[in-house]
Structure formats: structure tokens, C-alpha cells
């Protein structure tokens, strides 16, 4: 499995609402709608989505991007091309990880000129090229491309990684870095 890590710009400490916070931000109506739409598309009810948007605007970090917070539920959905894991946290925030469905891609017909994760096999070694792994926290999305190989259905290995991509609403990320955790895990942090 591949790891992705996103670190949010907001403080993990609650901020008293009676004092203006340096972490408070002003979101446009379009930004609020985009965040809310992302949250509700993954099953967060509208009222909870509005609550989370308000907390974000007032400088509160959501549980989904607070170090040490653990999800209270997780669901997984597989499609022909991807495996999507939605982790839900106590405050209602989510973390959605999307990686290629390697096994299904190996069985799918391959055509020339397609983009995204491409599969080929040579002897007992299976290769996936130009794959993408992404984590979406609604206000922050980040991920990277990578190549992957597997010999005899074991020894999975990420053979190349980068470039990365990201999108953030109401903030900025810096100091992007890759950390190789193991042969099969690479983490992108910011």
C-alpha cells in the first residue's frame, strides 16, 4: 500500500470565538460551496458540512487533518480503476484516499493512447506506470504519480514517484517532500 500525508495550515488548538484569530480566513461563497459539495458527495450531511466550513473559517483544524486523531469509521469502494477509502472522524470531517485498483487494471483490456495507470506484464513481473495516489480532505487535496511493480504476486515495489499535485482552499502549502517509508510506501508531506 502507498501512504500519503497531508498537513493543514490551520492550528490544531481550538481558538476562542470571542477573540479574533490570526488563523481565521474569509472564504468566498464559491469556496464554501466547493467544500460543502465535496463533503456531501462522500456522505457528510449538509448541516454537518456547513458546521465544518464554519469551523474552518474560524481557524479550527478538523479532526481529519489533526495529527494523532483517529477515524471512527472507514468504508472502501472499488471500481474498475480505483480503490477509494473514506475515513470519517468524530467531528464529521473525512479523509478520502484514492489509489489504483491494481488487480482490476491487470485484468482490464489495455489500449494505446490512454492516460493514467497503465499495466503490462513481462514474465512473472507485473508493471503499472503513471499511477496516481491522492488524499482529499475537502479543503486540501494532494497526491503524486508513481510507477509500481510486483514480482510473482509478492515483493510490491514503488520504482519511481513524482511529480506531486495539490489543491487547497483558503490557505497555502509549502515544503513539499517525499519520504520513502519502505519499498512499497512513499509519503508526500507538506
Region roles according to the model:
Residues 2, 73-77, 134-136:
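Generic marker of residues within folded, mature protein domains
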Residues 5, 78-80, 181:
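A generic structural signal for short, non-catalytic loop/turn and secondary-structure boundary residues
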Residues 12-119:
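N-terminal propeptides/leader regions of secreted preproproteins
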Residues 2-11:
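C-terminal segment of classical bacterial N-terminal signal peptides
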Residues 99-190:
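Mature secreted bioactive peptide module from preproproteins
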